[in-house]
Amino acid sequence: MDRMVTLAHKFLAEVVSCGDLALDLTAGGGRDTLFLAQRTGAAGRVFAFDIQKEALDRTRSLLEEQGLRASLLAERGFPRAESGIFLVKDGHERVGSYVRESVKGAIANLGYLPSGDRSIATRTETTLQALAETLPLLAPGGRLAVIAYVAHPGGRKESEAVSALFRDLPSDGWRTMKTEMMNRDASPFLLMAERV
């Protein structure tokens, strides 16, 4: 079976293309940022958020290995409408301080940085705020994918809250779906939303 990240990428690949604006709300190791950068191409823009310098360093290294260059945004503000990959050392809950334009695709891979400090993880309150700021940015047909993990401290509460947010989106403006492994305790699951 495909991993949740692979499914999330397939879901976003259907709508994110060259020249689009896309968001990685949790840069982590950089795989999602790289995927979005490859989809949006040289004419597109990707913003990748993380509070950890280590995560942004890993992301930058992965991008450079693939011949891609990223710029670090040192302070809040709206960069000119130039193309590129922008690494933002700030919480994902402040996405609205950096992005005001229509977004074609966004992804959040919740939890902690793999092989990193497990005490630093996404939190329910900031994740809900990040999603509340991201959803209105999505263009018609735009999509959001969230991979939720329940096994780390606070993960179950966060996962349940994000699931409730997706479930409660009005059906006349959104299509939502949840994909999960049913016979594995505490396995990650994927939440997907599309603006109609």
Model-predicted segments: where are they?
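S-adenosyl-L-methionine
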Residues: 1-21, 25, 31-34, 38-39, 56-101
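A short acidic, Gly/Pro-enriched loop at the edge of an enzyme's catalytic core
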Residues: 17, 96-107
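Short beta-strand element of Class I
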Residues: 43-49
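Conserved SAM/SAH-binding beta-strand->alpha-helix loop
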Residues: 52
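Mobile active-site "lid"/loop adjacent to the S-adenosyl-L-methionine
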Residues: 107-130
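Conserved beta-strand signature within the Rossmann-like core of class I S-adenosyl-L-methionine
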Residues: 137-148
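Class I S-adenosyl-L-methionine
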Residues: 152-196
